Amino acid sequence: DLMQFETLIMKSGVWYYGSYGCYCGSGGQFRPQDASDRCCFVHDCCYGKNGDIVCGGDDPCKKQICECDRVAATCFRDNKVTYDNKYWFFPAKFPPQNCKEESEPC
């Protein structure tokens, strides 16, 4: 859940990453701005490969979604030093021309 995710990354996931760089938050796209933003790119790619899956019980797809979250949380934690406040609310603070370089494919 979100609280466990935030504990692992040692930051508030929604507050710090809900609108960070070009990729974190809703509708992420274009080239990630730094290693923290890249964590969101990798997480989105992981979910994209698995589709919008809602699973329960011992279903293996639930395990894969949890693995996407685990990898992302570890990525955020390991790259916490790259977090740069200039990218916080980046798309909102700056015009979208800052997020226009295409990202590599997943």
From Swiss-Prot:
Chief subcellular location: secreted
EC number annotated for this UniProt entry: 3.1.1.4
Alphabetical list of CDD domains matching this protein: PLA2c
Cofactor details (free text): Binds 1 Ca(2+) ion.
Regulation of this protein's activity per its record: Partially inhibited by magnesium ions and completely inhibited by zinc ions These divalent cations may act as competitive antagonists of the cofactor.
Function, in words: Snake venom phospholipase A2 (PLA2) that induces inflammatory response, with local edema and release of cytokines IL-1 alpha, IL-6 and TNF-alpha. Does not exhibit myotoxic, anticoagulant and antibacterial effects. Release of pro-inflammatory cytokines may be due to mast cell degranulation, and edema may be induced by arachidonic acid that results from the PLA2 catalytic activity. PLA2 catalyzes the calcium-dependent hydrolysis of the 2-acyl groups in 3-sn-phosphoglycerides.
The protein's name: Acidic phospholipase A2 PhTX-III
Organism: Bothrocophias hyoprora (Amazonian hognose viper)
